[in-house]
Amino acid sequence: MASWVFCNRCFQSPHRKSSFSLTSCGHVYCHSCLLKGTKNECVICQAPCQTVLLSKHTNSNIQTFFLGIDGLCKKYSQETSQISEFQEKHRRRLVAFYQEKISQLEESLRKSVLQIKQLQSMRSSQQPAFNKIKNSVSTKPNGYLFLPPNSSLPDRIESMDIDLTPPARKPEMSAGPSRISVISPPQDGRMGSVTCRGPQHLSLTPSHASMTKASRVPPLQMPYKELSPPPASQLSSRATQGPSPSVSSSWTGPPRQPISISGLLQRQCAGSASPRGMDTEKMSPFLPSTPTNLRSVASPWHACVHR
């Protein structure tokens, strides 16, 4: 036990035969003074307390209070050095990591600066050619502005030209006749001349087209007279010769459509030129009736339009 330990009542220093006790209030008594006092009560401060016998088997926390200062400092210095060494080791590892990271960042920064310098030198060398191309392509031939790719979207929208004119429509061609046949009236028993004009000779406007549609002439219907019954000799001769091809074909075929002026004139010419002398009066039963008053015949020209 340390040399400074003694009894707080009789001031006796410890020896081999004596024993000392420690109270919870912090006082030390020898065994003889402890027996003189009241149990569970301190002799000096008269406060209730508990006592613990001091020996080698006492709790280490209690023994710490009786250690020497030099030994206590040595013990705690060793513990402190171990703790500081452990912390310093981890601190050095952290510093090494940050140093390596800083060196990597410095290297990347150096490369970036070098690359920027190279790009600036290339730009300065190519600036005249770029300005020339920019001036030549600043405006396109169709009048729209050329925008660089780095321009923002609102700038592009504001600079866009909007054409409000409606799209041009193709001129609508008026539906007109593909061919016009002009027939002059017959003169001296001869058929008039026929003149045909195709679409290449026509330049009809809508007004002319309406006039052309209005000037169409309906099919001409020839008047006919009732035939007197032929004599018996003519009937017998016709029976031996057989029926006329034109008449038989007219009866055997389907009903005929209205005959145009050109068809009538051709049939008239064919009837006058036949060797049997078939005239219009013989063909009249097969032709439609014509009104007596034909105003269209009195006109000098008749137009027949063929689709």
From Swiss-Prot:
It is found in: Nucleus; Chromosome. It comes from the Eukaryota. GO terms for molecular function: SUMO transferase activity; zinc ion binding. It holds the Pfam family zf-RING_5. Its EC number is 2.3.2.-. SUMO E3 ligase that acts as a regulator of crossing-over during meiosis: required to couple chromosome synapsis to the formation of crossover-specific recombination complexes. Localizes to recombination sites and stabilizes meiosis-specific recombination factors, such as MutS-gamma complex proteins (MSH4 and MSH5) and TEX11. May mediate sumoylation of target proteins MSH4 and/or MSH5, leading to enhance their binding to recombination sites. CDD domains: RING-HC_RNF212. A zinc finger (RING-type) spans 7-46. It comes from Mus musculus (Mouse). Pathway: Protein modification; protein sumoylation. PANTHER family: E3 SUMO-PROTEIN LIGASE RNF212-RELATED (PTHR22663:SF21), RING FINGER PROTEIN NARYA-RELATED (PTHR22663). GO terms for biological process: chiasma assembly; meiotic gene conversion; protein sumoylation; reciprocal meiotic recombination. GO terms for cellular component: synaptonemal complex. Keywords: Chromosome, Coiled coil, Meiosis, Metal-binding, Nucleus, Transferase, Ubl conjugation pathway, Zinc, Zinc-finger. Specifically expressed in meiocytes of the gonads. Its main location: nucleus. Residues 164-291 are annotated as: Disordered. This is Probable E3 SUMO-protein ligase RNF212. Disruption phenotype: Both male and female mice are sterile. Males do not make sperm and have much smaller testes, a characteristic of mutants with meiotic defects. Testes show an absence of post-anaphase I cells, indicating loss of spermatocytes at this stage (stage XII seminiferous tubules). In females, ovary size is similar to that of wild-type animals, and high numbers of oocytes are present in mature animals. Complete synapsis is achieved but crossover complexes are absent.
